[in-house]
């Protein structure tokens, strides 16, 4: 079997867990659950999140690094093996819980148990920026100027660029903020502004 993990004992990492694909996946799951809880409120219930294979590949691949599969080479079946319950590290299951993963046509469903939702609610700091952004875009008459001001409230070092792809009008992102590397893409639908956020690798894949 091809080695797919940085450590021989995947249940008890002896190295730096924070550099692993599992840690990157865990952060993404927690970020999305936080965002959902800010939008909809907290309930101790199962949460199902969907990822394309390409996004999961970005978490687990690092071209040229030891013990990694070359970029673009992890198949759907290999990813299911990586995310098999028997391969999940204790560091992940102690936080987000015993996730269940299924896949079809390179689209993955990651099912987070109620305990994972509870952990995010009770043991992670609130994301004040996301909460304010959600409240702002939900306000009638919200403008891009107000949204830009909100970004500047949290950092003087941001980037804002127009987008000409017909789907979004512009993106804003924080620079030099390692905990928030997302591209926040906005579209003015006339009556309100919507946003989606993308990790840098996914943004590059889309070719916006």
Task: List each model region and its residues.
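Short, non-transmembrane alpha-helical segments in secretory-pathway proteins
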Residues: 28-31, 132-157
